[in-house]
Regions:
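Proteins enriched for Cys/Gly/acidic motifs involved in redox and nucleic-acid/cofactor modification
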Residues: 1-204, 243, 258, 280-291, ...
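A structural micro-motif
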Residues: 3, 31, 75, 99, ...
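Generic beta-strand/beta-sheet core signal
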Residues: 8, 197-199, 233-235, 261-263, ...
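Conserved SAM/AdoMet-binding glycine-rich loop
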Residues: 77-81, 86, 91, 188-312, ...
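Conserved, mostly hydrophobic/aromatic
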Residues: 159, 179, 196, 232, ...
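Short beta-alpha junctions and helix-cap segments that line functional grooves
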Residues: 244-245, 317, 410-411
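Terminal RNA-binding accessory module
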Residues: 344-440
Length: 440
């Protein structure tokens, strides 16, 4: 029978895609999916379990639902995703309010879990996290005009600080046909921007063709009518080759924005991280990318406070950032993840010091970003409109901005959400741009 269900999605974009798949299955089964927990038969929390802050957020959400359940406003709680995969026994023992769990290999069984839990069971579905990828439809929940497209699952990089391979399993590529078919379906829905994601998109095809084949996939995606922007997230530096660089430079649909997680520039820290490139190799790659791809915007993520990072290593990182002037940077203080090599390393940096260093990098980066935005003033830039207020003020993003992590363009004009329009940039403030739509 149909039930009233609320699905709460936490964590990263990859997790959001899993939530969209579960929404699709629940809708297909005839369940009523709503946005409020009160009065629901089942609340599903799709969790992240990667770093301490994400784990805390997930546990807090579960405890909030437990209070609603205790008050009679909710019947059952299901927990899915990375936290349940990683801490199955702990959740069972410490959170008796949880009525069932699904791991990262079992999203396709969500409807069975709902039926089970509503009939008095306590379902524990933990399929093979390294098994074949199950192709499931999606209910797109992102903003108008754009959607994530996940091209692979799992990870084979085994960075010393990261538990993702243990949580999500080995790297598995989706097939070319499955990805292209999904992209066409997204285009048919009005999606203009595909944001290509995986834990490591540069490795796509290794398990299918015996070599990294991202360029092959991107050529096929670029053929799809209606798709105007293809944005690339999480390219590992050691696999970016000349074929891929040439394609990015010459294919108009691939936006000149690359998210390359570098994490650090000091050789010893990179070695401790089990990264597979040196500081000099990173410098050479970024120099090559700048030379070959005009207008390139680079984003990276960094970690401060890894065991062994002293003042000298941190200062090398800051000096490099001042020199290379990356347009977009995310930084995280080191979080020791149990079961990872970095969690048992000696020569620890105190958490407060790791946070202080992260804050210093953000302060440094804010000035670099402000300089980039100031240089945009006077330019006419293509903007994907995402919101339009009753006042007529619109907001959206240029090619230089990825949703939720980068800046916004606020502009006057007649654009509707999902439209791609030309905006004359007239100002900037606190990481965002201002402008006026040019009516063509």
């Amino acid at each position: 029978m149909p039930y009233r269900i609320c699905l709460i999605s936490l964590g990263c974009a990859k997790n959001q895609v899993n939530s969209e798949q579960m929404l699709y299955l629940l809708n297909q089964a005839g369940h009523e999916v709503v946005g409020e927990v009160d009065g629901c038969d089942v609340a599903i929390v799709n969790t992240c379990g990667f770093i301490d802050s994400a784990k805390s957020e997930a546990i807090d959400q579960i405890l909030q639902l437990a209070e609603v359940k205790k008050a009679g406003g909710l019947k059952k709680i299901l927990v899915t995703g990375c936290l349940s995969q990683r801490y199955e026994k702990d959740i069972l023992e410490s959170l008796p309010e949880v009525d069932g769990m699904l791991g990262t290999g079992s999203f396709g069984q969500i409807c069975a879990a709902v039926e089970d839990v509503m009939h008095g069971g306590r379902p524990l579905y933990f399929g093979d996290k390294s098994g074949p990828i199950e192709e499931i439809g999606r209910v797109v929940t992102t903003g108008p005009g754009w959607a994530y497209q996940r091209i692979a699952e799992g990870c084979d990089n085994w960075c010393a600080f990261c538990a993702i391979p243990a949580i999500r399993g080995r790297y598995r590529s989706r097939t070319l046909d499955a990805i292209v078919q999904e992209a066409q379906e997204l285009a048919d829905l009005g999606v203009k921007e595909l944001i290509v994601i995986a834990q490591d998109i540069t490795r796509w095809g290794m398990d299918l063709y015996g070599k990294p084949s991202l360029a092959l996939l991107l050529r096929e995606l670029a053929k799809i009518d209606g798709i105007r922007w293809i944005r690339l997230h999480y390219l590992y530096p050691e696999i970016i080759d000349d074929e891929l660089i040439d394609l990015i430079a010459n294919e108009d649909k691939i936006v000149k924005y690359l998210d390359i997680p570098i994490q650090h520039i000091d050789n010893d820290i990179l070695r401790r991280m089990n990264r597979h490139c040196t500081g000099d190799e990173i410098r050479a790659l970024l120099q090559k990318l700048r030379a070959r791809i005009p207008g390139l915007v680079l984003r990276t993520s960094l970690i401060t406070g890894l065991p062994g990072e002293g003042e000298a290593e941190f200062e090398e990182l800051c000096t490099w950032l001042r020199e290379v002037r990356l347009e977009r940077v995310g930084v995280f203080p080191f979080s020791p993840e149990e079961g990872t090599p970095a969690a048992v390393m000696t020569d620890r940096c105190e958490p407060d010091e790791a946070q202080r260093r992260a804050d210093l990098i953000l302060e440094l980066q804010a000035g670099i970003m402000d300089d980039y935005n100031a240089a945009c003033i006077g330019r006419d830039m293509t903007v994907l409109c995402e919101h339009r207020a009753r006042s007529g003020m619109c907001s959206g993003r240029t090619y230089a901005d990825s949703p939720e992590i980068d800046g916004t363009v606020y502009f006057t004009g007649a654009a509707r959400p999902g439209d791609m329009v030309t905006v004359h940039i007239t100002g900037c403030d606190d990481g965002d741009l201002a402008g006026e739509q040019i009516h063509e």
